């Protein structure tokens, strides 16, 4: 898997993982009764997933993983 593919997977899977985690933690993104805290927490989780995957990519590149061109 190339660096470019991993970057694309980051974009594809970050939002679904965020929605899944927020749903499992009993927060509601869609529906009645949303508070600004719920939306804020879901946004923080979303950013966390993006940073986690970016960090994994940096470690892979640092360890000598090639771009796969």
Swiss-Prot record:
Q: Which GO terms describe its biological process?
A: bacteriocin immunity
Membrane topology note: Multi-pass membrane protein
Q: Which residues lie on this side of the membrane: Cytoplasmic?
A: 1-6, 62-69
Which coarse location class describes where this protein primarily resides?
membrane
| GO cellular component, as recorded | plasma membrane
What is this protein's function per UniProt? Protects a microcin H47-producer cell against microcin H47.
**Could you identify this protein by its name?**
Microcin H47 immunity protein MchI
What is the originating organism of this protein? Escherichia coli
């Amino acid at each position: 898997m190339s660096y470019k593919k991993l970057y694309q997977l980051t974009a594809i899977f970050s939002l679904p993982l965020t929605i899944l985690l927020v749903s499992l933690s009993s927060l509601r993104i869609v529906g009645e009764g949303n508070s600004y805290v719920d939306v804020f927490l879901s946004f923080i989780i979303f950013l966390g997933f993006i940073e986690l995957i970016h960090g994994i990519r940096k470690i892979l590149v640092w360890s000598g993983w090639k771009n796969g061109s």
